[in-house]
Structure formats: C-alpha cells, structure tokens
Amino acid sequence: MGGRRILDRVVDVLERAAGSPPLLVANAADAAQWRPDLAVVPDVLPGHGSLGGILTAVETAGAALCVAWDMPFVSADLLAALAAGLAAADAVVPESDSRRGLEPLCAAYGPACGPAIRAAIARGDARAIGFHGEVRVARLPRAAVLQYGDPAVLFFNVNTPDDLARAEVICRNHASFR
C-alpha cells in the first residue's frame, strides 16, 4: 500500500508508540521471514483466533499493545494513549463506530487479562471481548479517539482486494499516510 507493506506500517507505528520493537504473534511457518528483525511467537493456544493472539501477547510480554496487522492507519499517539491507560485498568479499548462500538484488536492489555482470556477460551467464548467482564476495562471514548483521527480511517481493516483499493485511495488522499 503506497509502496510499503501494511505489516511494516503497523510495526513502525507500534515501535514509535512503545519505544521498542514489537512482538509479532503469528502461526505461519514463514512468519520469521516477514520481519527478520522481530521476535516471532506462535499462539500459546492455537486455534482461538484473535483472542489466542492477545493471550500470547500478554503471556509473553506482560502488558501489550495489540494491533491487527491489517490495520494500516492506526496512530502511534492513539496507541501511546491506550498504553498510558493501563496505569488504571487491565485493558484499555478505544470506542469506534463498529458494530460492537469497540476496537478490541487495537487495544492495550495488561497481565491480568491472561487468566481471564484463558477462562473465556475454556468456556468456549473466543470473542475478542469475551473476557472483558472479568477484568477492569477502560474505554477510550470516541470523542478522545477523534483527537487522533477519524475512527473509520484509524481502525480500517484490509481484508479483501476491494479493501486494499480503498486503503490505497485513503493513503493517496492523506499526506500523513504516504
């Protein structure tokens, strides 16, 4: 997208927000080749989708900023705000215009989330928010998210060729994404 891989964009933003290289949670056999400079860790409980990835991140790193690698327009400043919120909560999740009103795949999670995620998986709940009732969750209000950009752009996911074409248009029309 715009001459750069989406993964590279996300890694760069995470590194700016956290001040250190991120951990790449991936199960693909060739994942270590995607970014040889990053530590790659497979899911600790394979087969549980995004929730398994969040679990892996918190059990490996303790506190973790988790961002889906197909979210090319997320902001480093937004991620830093989410991470700062962990001082008063176990998870910090931004509000959005999505169906569920939250973006759990662009959030900060603390170590207390690990046992709660394991409990959710054990009861068959693999939703990315399935453990939220068991931990202290702070919501970053949509009004606060707007300080970092349009939520529809910040949390845009590239899942299809049509999404990629839309992302290319966004990239061309916003100088900050080039």
Feature names for model-found ranges:
Residues 156-158:
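Conserved anion/nucleotide-ligand pocket segment
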Residues 1-125, 133-154, 169-172:
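Nucleotide and nucleotide-moiety/phosphate-recognizing core
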Residues 161-178:
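SAM-dependent methyltransferases
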Residues 132, 160:
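A residue-level signal for conserved active-site and pocket-lining positions in enzyme catalytic cores
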